[in-house]
């Protein structure tokens, strides 16, 4: 899945402020990565969601995201839920799945 969304912000933010907010929000998430540019091939067959932010103006940004809906979606989610049900770290075993592009 490749998403491109244009968003209007309620307040003015610089691109650096937006990147900092993103990294503060998702710094503890194993499978969410900030990328300068998102490329679908980098998430194919993986449990990663890659996100990039580009700025049109102080209040308009473009967010792009890429994920594999089989791994990050159905099968990756099933493994994460199994782990949580059995009191294991949610990312146990998921990080060892090799992406298709390697």
Predicted regions and their residues:
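NAD(P)-dependent Rossmann-like dehydrogenase/reductase catalytic/cofactor-binding core
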Residues: 48-50, 54-102
């Amino acid at each position: 899945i490749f998403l491109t969304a244009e968003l209007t912000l309620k307040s003015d933010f610089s691109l650096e402020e937006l990147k900092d907010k993103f990294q503060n929000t998702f710094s503890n998430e194993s499978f969410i990565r900030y990328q300068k540019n998102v490329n679908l091939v980098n998430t194919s067959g993986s449990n990663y969601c890659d996100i990039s932010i580009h700025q049109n103006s102080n209040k308009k940004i473009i967010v792009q995201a890429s994920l594999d809906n089989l791994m990050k979606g159905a099968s990756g989610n099933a493994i994460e839920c199994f782990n949580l049900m059995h009191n294991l770290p949610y990312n146990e075993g998921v990080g060892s799945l090799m992406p298709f592009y390697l």
